[in-house]
């Protein structure tokens, strides 16, 4: 089962400018803390759905041998500009992950897992990660919750108007299916002298899952897992907007 390869094509060039409020520094500090708690201070770390390389580049600066994986060639091009040459960037579908060896850890931030809109897609990804993860390795990922989609996004239209780029984000959330659909319309300046802007549109779909369903699926795939409120060690509440899963591959 494959993901949609068309997402983040027109968005890649402007993603970092429009998403400059994403708290990557806080997420990175949390991820680094979890890695070190699990005695992973060096070696190979795989960044799934790495996008433009915001987390990838930070982990590389920490001294890890980082592999960044994303479905979008355009996002990987942006990541190449941001990451040192030592970082290996691969265009792959997470559901069909294929590596030459194992890694000490896998990470996936900024709701990359929410793009897997069927449980079977998540199962395939979890099984692949388990296969390529070292014994005693750790799989760290976040997911947005149903509460976030329903109460923070909902059926809103969000606009962001900058000097050289503008965004219209039309959002629609279906509580019954857990599917969150959004249409992005981007106007990006292509000629400053003539004030010419190029319009592109992208359609994205994410899905919210009950946290317990994810925990059970991780266990079915062989992991021992915990789930926390984002950037804490607290148990998620009914109003948690983003949860972090910490999944271990333990010897049988």
Annotate the PLM regions.
Residues 109-111:
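Residues lining the SAM
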Residues 46, 53-96:
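Class I SAM-dependent methyltransferase SAM/SAH-binding core
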Residues 98-105:
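A short acidic, Gly/Pro-enriched loop at the edge of an enzyme's catalytic core
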Residues 1-41:
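Conserved class I S-adenosyl-L-methionine
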Residues 140-215:
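SAM-dependent methyltransferase
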């Amino acid at each position: 089962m494959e993901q949609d390869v068309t997402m983040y094509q027109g968005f890649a060039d402007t993603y970092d400018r429009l998403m400059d409020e994403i708290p990557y520094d806080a997420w990175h500090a949390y991820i680094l803390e979890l890695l070190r708690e699990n005695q992973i201070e060096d070696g190979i770390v795989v960044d799934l759905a790495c996008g433009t390389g915001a987390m990838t580049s930070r982990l590389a600066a920490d001294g890890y041998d980082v592999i960044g994986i994303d479905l979008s060639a355009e996002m990987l091009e942006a990541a190449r500009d941001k990451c040192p040459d030592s970082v290996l960037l691969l265009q792959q579908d997470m559901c069909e992950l294929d590596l030459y060896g194992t890694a000490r850890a896998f990470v996936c931030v900024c709701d990359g897992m929410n793009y897997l809109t069927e449980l079977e897609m998540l199962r395939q990804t979890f099984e692949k990660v388990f296969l390529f993860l070292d014994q005693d390795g750790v799989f760290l990922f976040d997911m947005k919750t149903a509460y976030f989609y329903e109460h923070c996004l909902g059926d809103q239209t969000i606009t962001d108007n900058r000097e050289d780029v503008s965004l219209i984000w039309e959002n629609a959330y279906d509580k019954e299916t857990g599917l969150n659909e959004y249409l992005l319309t981007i106007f990006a300046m292509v000629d400053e002298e003539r004030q010419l802007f190029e319009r592109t549109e992208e359609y994205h779909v994410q899905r919210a899952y009950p946290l317990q369903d994810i925990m059970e699926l991780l266990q079915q795939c062989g992991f021992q897992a915990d789930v926390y409120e984002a950037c804490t060690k607290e148990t998620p509440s009914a109003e948690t907007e983003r949860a972090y899963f910490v999944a271990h591959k333990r010897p049988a």
